[in-house]
């Protein structure tokens, strides 16, 4: 859902120079396609904010035409990120900056040019193959621990001994493993 908010009261403020870029806050002086990697990263993880019209040092520069810039940002996101991320755009009228707030998405991974991104402190980087697989599972609402284990010939002698010592469970069976979410009848043992 995309929302334009023309904000006449809320202002980023003159003290923005005290603010620094973080894992969830990015400054962009102008609108270039590089912000799309950050939109992917924010959608894939914890969300975040990109403020356009502010340089890397936190100095407000403003944008020449904030309304047109807002439309440009929306079009770039809609044309370049798949699936469609959840975001809002706010024009800060008193300093001609634009605040893009990106929510963490549910349909992960969010891709820009067929690649998924994440934030590493203040940098945006491409995820590796393992992390990409984890994002796919998360997008399907599946955790690694819920996947069937490739090796179904497992023994739980140490677990049995510890359960016996700590909480006096003497009867160790598949029902015990089901209770611990380590086994189900359909898929057998899981990760």
Q: Where do the language-model regions lie?
A:
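Polybasic/polar functional segments that serve as interface/processing modules
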Residues: 1-50, 54-116, 150, 173, ...
